[in-house]
């Protein structure tokens, strides 16, 4: 039988970077980590971008990191999944999108595309509009109208005109589509039940009511001239020969191409719910309505283009199915990460899964208490190791991330030192019972606290690699280079002498 327990230790926000300036990880006094990295198998792992299912070059985050670790496979985020489907051609065979096209052909009606027109990548991506336009062209659909919601929050405040110009150039190139209306996201993408705002966007879409302009760009420029930027552009209709270019009518098809649900729900309900009381809508305009993702299961009369796959056979589930006992330990700030996210978005604990929560300190900002609750978390970990009750323990130390977010270098250094002191105590306890441990991080943060270009404080996550260290395992094992977070569960499973389930597509990092 393998060593027991097997501990997965996650040092949240503990990235690795060569430069020492603004690098709390390098500036901190960390003799324990230095010794572990020198004496045990150690490699750098990837925790950002495509390696964790995010767009290339995008910094990792805690939710995505823990999801990938617990799943033992790369979990593609909506943005990446849709972009990938366009690139590999699956997009053009999407059932919901094809049904929307069929409806238009059958009724000789129009296809309306609506959503946030930018490359912000938070709610939508402009390249996805190009994908739908290309699909419409291939399907021989001529009446295609885009209703542009302007961003200015995830993009510069007056960049909307430029995005619409890019879109119009692309429509010309593909040979289909024209802009029919424009609205600031303040109106079209409200999420606080301010129905008076949503009503303005809806009336422009369906009734052609509101301000008018002879072209989308002219209307946006007129708004800029009045010092009203993208987010707040009052909904306007683009006219042709004095009338609205196009409005959404009975038997038309509508594709809402936002992939993030929270700000797409209200407008979708306005189109889809039979009984609607947000404002005086009148009868529902019956359309074939496609949401890019599932905005809300309770919304009626709609289809979903990209359905979220449920993540089966996560590491926690696998342990439970094999009758093994596991503990999850974290302080409040990262408790959801080692439970809900690590379990693939499932709230209920697995059979034999104990959860140990330590309260995070109540301070305004964590630079005021950089050690946070690390010592208490460490005590719980040492207790769990010594109890010999658990086959697997998953533990998260929040400090490098939470204190890193404050951008206060002195505090971040203290945070790193506190955590590394805890690592030392855990290693001692582990050796006493002859257990084994894999140390890693979910993404970087504390190793970069200064923006290299501006010299200003840098408080975000990073794209830097993270440490992978194998402690007190079979000395015949080494770790391979080039691994990512999805490879961790398969590694632990091999360490425990078990067979990796088929659903896990990550690859063990162990080499003999």
Model-derived features: positions:
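Feature captures the catalytic ectodomains and active-site-proximal regions of enzymes
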Residues: 1-512
């Amino acid at each position: 039988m393998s060593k027991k327990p097997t501990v997965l230790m996650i040092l949240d926000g503990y990235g690795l970077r060569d430069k020492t300036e603004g690098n709390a990880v390098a500036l901190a006094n960390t003799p324990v980590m230095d010794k572990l990295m020198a004496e045990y198998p150690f490699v750098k792992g990837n925790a950002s971008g495509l390696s964790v299912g995010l767009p290339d070059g995008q910094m990792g985050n805690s939710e995505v990191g823990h999801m990938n670790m617990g799943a033992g496979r790369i979990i593609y985020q909506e943005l990446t999944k849709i972009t990938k489907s366009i690139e590999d051609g699956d997009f053009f065979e999407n059932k919901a999108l094809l049904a929307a096209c069929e409806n238009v052909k059958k009724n000789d009606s129009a296809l309306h595309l609506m959503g946030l027109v930018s490359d912000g990548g938070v709610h939508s991506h402009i390249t996805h509009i190009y994908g739908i336009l290309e699909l419409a062209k291939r399907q021989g659909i001529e009446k295609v109208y885009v209703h542009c919601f302007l961003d200015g929050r995830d993009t510069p405040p007056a960049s909307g005109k430029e995005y619409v110009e890019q879109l119009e150039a692309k429509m010309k190139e593909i040979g289909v589509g024209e802009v029919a209306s424009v609205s600031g996201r303040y109106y079209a993408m409200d999420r606080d039940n301010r129905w008076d705002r949503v009503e303005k966007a809806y009336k422009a879409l369906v009734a052609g009511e509101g301000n008018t302009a002879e072209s989308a760009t002219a209307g946006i420029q007129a708004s800029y001239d009045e010092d009203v930027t993208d987010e707040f552009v009052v909904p306007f209709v683009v006219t042709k020969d004095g009338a609205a270019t196009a409005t959404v009518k009975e038997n038309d098809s509508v594709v809402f191409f936002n992939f993030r649900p929270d700000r797409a729900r209200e407008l979708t309900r306005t189109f889809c719910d039979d009984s609607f009381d947000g404002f005086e809508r009148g009868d529902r305009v019956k359309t074939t309505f496609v949401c890019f993702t599932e905005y809300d299961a309770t919304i009626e009369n709609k289809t979903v283009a990209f359905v979220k796959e449920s993540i089966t056979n996560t590491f926690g589930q696998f342990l439970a199915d094999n009758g093994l006992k596991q503990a999850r330990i974290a302080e409040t700030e990262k408790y959801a990460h080692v439970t809900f996210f690590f379990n693939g978005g499932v709230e209920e604990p697995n059979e034999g899964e104990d959860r140990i929560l330590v309260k995070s300190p109540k301070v305004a900002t964590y630079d005021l208490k950089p050690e946070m609750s690390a010592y208490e978390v460490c005590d719980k970990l040492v207790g769990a190791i010594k109890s010999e009750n658990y086959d697997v323990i998953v533990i998260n130390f929040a400090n490098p991330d939470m204190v890193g977010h404050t951008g206060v270098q002195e505090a971040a250094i203290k945070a790193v030192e506190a955590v590394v002191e805890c690592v030392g105590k855990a290693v001692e306890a582990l050796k006493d019972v002859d257990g084994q441990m894999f140390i890693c991080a979910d993404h970087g943060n504390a190793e970069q606290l200064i923006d290299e270009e501006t010299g200003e404080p840098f408080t975000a996550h990073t794209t830097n690699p993270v440490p992978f260290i194998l402690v007190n395992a079979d000395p015949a094992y080494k770790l391979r280079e080039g691994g990512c977070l999805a490879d961790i569960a398969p590694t632990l499973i091999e360490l425990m002498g078990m067979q990796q389930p088929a659903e896990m597509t990550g690859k063990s990092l162990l080499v003999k």
